[in-house]
Amino acid sequence: MGARNSVLRGKKADELEKIRLRPSGKKKYRLKHIVWAANELDKFGLAESLLESKEGCQKILTVLDPLVPTGSENLKSLFNTVCVIWCLHAEEKVKDTEEAKKLVQRHLGAETGTAEKMPSTSRPTAPPSGRGRNFPVQQTGGGNYIHVPLSPRTLNAWVKLVEDKKFGAEVVPGFQALSEGCTPYDINQMLNCVGDHQAAMQIIREIINDEAADWDAQHPIPGPLPAGQLRDPRGSDIAGTTSTVEEQIQWMYRPQNPVPVGNIYRRWIQIGLQKCVRMYNPTNILDVKQGPKEPFQSYVDRFYKSLRAEQTDPAVKNWMTQTLLIQNANPDCKLVLKGLGMNPTLEEMLTACQGVGGPGQKARLMAEALKEALTPPPIPFAAAQQRKVIRCWNCGKEGHSARQCRAPRRQGCWKCGKTGHVMAKCPERQAGFLGMGPWGKKPRNFPVAQAPPGLIPTAPPADPAVDLLERYMQQGREQREQRERPYKEVTEDLLHLEQGKAPHREATEDLLHLNSLFGKDQ
């Protein structure tokens, strides 16, 4: 750590903290960026001590500069950091990383005076046509075309692509890029370099034979040709089995009616490679679904990888992208994606689902679940008003019932303390709405006004009609008793006569005579 801190000291370290990472950004360089750059130098076999001087930084830049155009983000960040350190050692005032890069490229270009130290964006690139110096067919100064064999580097890249991807969806565009401008002879060399996967090679050979037969059927032989005239290619000529390299070049670049046999052969092989891709990748795009804990970005990568292997119309692929991508997402991401509206872009979907399925969302879901589990259910207002504190009838304490009480059992009634009855039948129970009940006592829940002693009530006297009515009622009761009495006595005497006893009254026969009913005139 001490050696890394010695890269910049004193004033240079203060100047480093004033340089911005981006022209319009707020973040600035810190010593941790120097430590990171020292760690990255080990990956390129460069010593950390080179950062301590201007010449050492210049050597690092010489090594990294050719790799910047095709390098990764870490490589570009390392190049930018070394540019800033070079400016500090050279005592050049810069405000941000872009100024440091321009200053370094200008100084290095002035010192070397070659195009190798020019800015990466201004370097000449290879021509896009098939006539560059890296392609098999090249044109000489006299206008003639010559054949240059494929370099071992190209063949090695093709073999490594097949071995690493194992006929994945990347093999087809890889073959298309490596075989650009090649003749059928060169393409056969590439196919012969594949040692393994002979089943896939046999599928490609069958596709080539079928396409060659179709070519022969569509292009019949016109007839005998004059001597010295180049014949038209047959299917086997396009496949490179019955033609030479010189004939293939002449067919490709003749002025009249050229036949691009190389591109035709490439197209046949691409059809075979696409069938091999479907065979080695049987996963259907309809089966690509996002897992419950899978990040949305990983699911999108798998989806587009399977979509790339699908050999369908672009309109069908567009429909799959708009429909299946959202339909096969997990419920969490699907809920977020439906809130984006109709036909959201892929950038909007990736941004919206960036945190779904991550540790942050898992923590929030767990916190919500725990909150719901630990929160007691709400008590209704009426139940809360009616809720009372439980009191024990045995010991008189609150918080438990008599059944749960641990104190000794109390004898007698728990209400009044007397023996002989239980609390449910206690005569001293609490008065109801109408009083204490039918026990011969006056109700004690109504206030009674006590008249002070020495005062005479001033209420009016009773109504005389009430007394008169009571007297009439009493007389009526007496008359009814008198009318019922003779019949009762006669009935009792007859019962005594039947039993052979003497009657209680001597006038029984008189009472039984009709004179008792109709008088003495009968």
UniProtKB/Swiss-Prot annotation:
GO terms for biological process: viral budding via host ESCRT complex; viral translational frameshifting. Residues 12-19 are annotated as: Interaction with host AP3D1. Residues 7-31 are annotated as: Interaction with Gp41. A motif (Nuclear export signal) lies at residues 16-22. Residues 8-43 are annotated as: Interaction with host CALM1. The keyword Metal-binding applies. SMART domains: ZnF_C2HC. Residues 280-366 are annotated as: Dimerization/Multimerization of capsid protein p24. Keywords: AIDS, Capsid protein, Host cell membrane, Host cytoplasm, Host endosome, Host membrane, Host nucleus, Host-virus interaction, Lipoprotein, Membrane, Metal-binding, Myristate, Phosphoprotein, Repeat, RNA-binding, Viral budding, Viral budding via the host ESCRT complexes, Viral nucleoprotein, Viral release from host cell, Virion, Zinc, Zinc-finger. A zinc finger (CCHC-type) spans 390-407, 411-428. Residues 73-77 are annotated as: Interaction with membrane phosphatidylinositol 4,5-bisphosphate. A lipid is attached at G2 (N-myristoyl glycine). This is Gag polyprotein. It comes from Human immunodeficiency virus type 2 subtype A (isolate Ghana-1) (HIV-2).
